[in-house]
């Protein structure tokens, strides 16, 4: 039997589907077994993809890794074989937003989108009456100690880009300038104002930790920006639902 090793991250969203699909694959191809290993989200992000590529046959990656993978020739280009052409077109056409295209670099497809992560707001429906509609509303709620917001560096830049897009200045790789300085300063001012009102722990939190807290405590009702996990809006996943 041929054994293939895979690496993903330690969360039901990243691990459970891989194990389930590996089981289905083994039923169809009994001579091949896929064994998935997992590590924490932070350890997963910190370990260079170059090292993982040498240790594993399959990897769950984030799209920012694609450039390095292409430059160092670390990952097989899925479009190399014509037999996958129809499947790749189908996946692209059914993709949520640019999920599929985000793994395409220099006209090569290096990975498939197994799910879609997008910056969203999250809230406890049982704790909040009026969901904020503007940034000013978020500030007012934060002044009541009701807001949590993951702002580790990698999440801060995601929030920065999201706010820029909502203000009408989406980051575009075709632009020669990343963002106008005056716009950037305005966004940083907004982020600073909110950061001063949320718990200090937010400086070291990621979206999973934020959602875990919101679903198991009753003192936070809202988060303005984080990568969403639909698991938390399903009955029985945690103590309380987070939408």
Predicted regions and their residues:
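Extracytoplasmic/periplasmic substrate-binding proteins
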Residues: 197-243
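Early extracytoplasmic/lumenal segment of secretory-pathway proteins
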Residues: 1-67, 90
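Short helix-loop capping/hinge motifs at secondary-structure junctions, enriched
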Residues: 126-133, 196-197
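Extracytoplasmic/periplasmic solute-binding protein
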Residues: 110-113, 119, 137-179, 183, ...
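Short helices/loops that flank or line small-molecule/ion binding pockets
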Residues: 44-55, 72, 140, 207-223
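Short, solvent-exposed loop/beta-turn-alpha elements that line the ligand-binding surface or hinge
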Residues: 82-91, 145-146, 168-188, 234-237
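Glycine-centered hinge/linker elements that transmit conformational signals in sensory
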Residues: 175-207
């Amino acid at each position: 039997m041929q054994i293939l090793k895979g690496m993903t991250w330690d969360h039901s969203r990243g691990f459970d589907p891989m194990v389930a699909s590996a089981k289905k694959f083994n039923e169809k191809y009994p001579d091949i077994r896929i064994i998935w290993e997992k590590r924490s989200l932070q350890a997963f992000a910190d370990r260079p993809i170059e090292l993982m590529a040498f240790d594993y046959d399959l990897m769950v990656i984030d799209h920012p890794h694609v450039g390095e993978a292409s430059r160092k020739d670390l990952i097989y280009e899925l479009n190399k074989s014509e037999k996958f052409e129809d499947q790749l077109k189908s996946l692209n056409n059914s993709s949520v937003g640019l999920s599929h295209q985000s793994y395409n670099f220099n006209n090569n497809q290096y990975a498939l989108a197994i799910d879609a992560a997008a910056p969203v707001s999250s809230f406890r429906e049982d704790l909040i009456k009026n969901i904020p509609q503007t940034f000013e509303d978020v500030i007012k709620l934060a002044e009541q100690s009701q807001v949590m917001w993951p702002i580790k560096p990698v999440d801060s830049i995601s929030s920065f880009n999201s706010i820029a897009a909502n203000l009408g200045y989406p980051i575009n790789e075709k632009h020669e300038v990343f963002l106008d300085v005056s716009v950037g300063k305005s966004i940083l001012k907004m982020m600073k104002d909110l950061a001063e009102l949320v718990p200090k722990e937010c400086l070291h939190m990621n979206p999973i930790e934020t959602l875990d807290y919101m679903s198991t405590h009753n003192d936070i009702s809202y988060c303005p920006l984080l990568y969403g996990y639909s698991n938390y809006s399903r009955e029985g996943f945690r103590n309380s639902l987070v939408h």
